[in-house]
Amino acid sequence: SLDRRQRQMCIRDSIYSHGWMIVRQDYSLIYNLNKLLRNMKKIFLIALFALLPFSLNAESNLDKILSSGVLKVGTTGDWDPMTMKDPATNKYKGFDIDVMNELAKDMGVKVEFVPAEWKTIVSGITSERYDISTSVTKTPKRAEVAGFTDTYYKYGTVPLVLKKNLKKFPTWNSLNNSNVTIATTLGTSQEEKAKEFFPKSKLNSVEAPARDFQEVLAGRADGNITSSTEANKLVIKYPQLAIVPDGEKNPAFLAMMVPKGDNKWNSYVNDWIKNKKSSGFFTKLLAKYNLKSL
């Protein structure tokens, strides 16, 4: 009947009408999503370009050093024979000091040694207090925020104890005991290694200018670990100390720290190290300080 056809047409028109509204809503949603994505893309590009001037146009430390005529070097002054500070004169001496003096001389600039502590030596690089550090051990933790030059010296790690306690502590493992106290110096690579080698032992961390081996000498710790380089010097200076005769562990590499991402400055120092190795400079310097790289 006519009424039936009219009802069908009304239903059809209603479906078309609602369908068009749904389609319009879908198109509106898609349009708004596209608009949102375009805005997000603009924000991302603005942020990216805001960073580009620093990354592309930032002045390299090499340019700053040559312009100012001064090479700023961060050093702790407490690592015999690498860097030692004479409290009477406030002057530095040692293997690292000779290296930095030679670098400054070859660059035609003056060297300025900036006092640093092991616990903050990395932050001195990141905060640009100095352009480069004297020798530090390459570690993954330090490499997260600082750059490293090529290495020029390799050493092992050894424990030190009182000579009278050698029979009690003849091996590395004998020091890994809950009744044993191991001294460490805050911020050093040895602090990290002590946690790895002696998980059962109690750790006594001291802050520079105090040193871990001094805790052993004073009887407040049973032992400490240090580089074979420093250990060989300490047992001569302090005959009451002895190296645990169990062999060296954890060969480590020394390098200078530089600002991370400053490839121009890092490459310059690496080329300098390479040339100095070829010329025999490092070989002569190692002999001067009775050092032997592994």
Region roles according to the model:
Residues 77, 154-161, 228, 232-274, ...:
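Periplasmic-binding protein-like
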Residues 69-75, 93, 172-187:
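Short loop->beta-strand "edge-of-pocket" segments that line small-molecule binding or catalytic clefts
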Residues 62, 163-180:
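Flexible hinge/capping segments at coil-to-helix
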Residues 1-14:
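Single conserved hydrophobic/aromatic residue that forms the stacking wall/gate
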Residues 119-123, 136-144, 192-196, 214-250:
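A ligand-binding cleft/hinge motif common to bilobed small-molecule-binding domains
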Residues 59-136, 144:
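Extracytoplasmic small-molecule ligand-binding "clamshell" domains
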Residues 60, 189-203, 243-245, 273-294:
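Ligand-binding clefts/hinges and TM-proximal coupling segments of bilobed small-molecule sensing domains
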Residues 97-98, 112-123, 204-218, 252:
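Short helix-initiation/N-cap motifs at beta->coil->alpha
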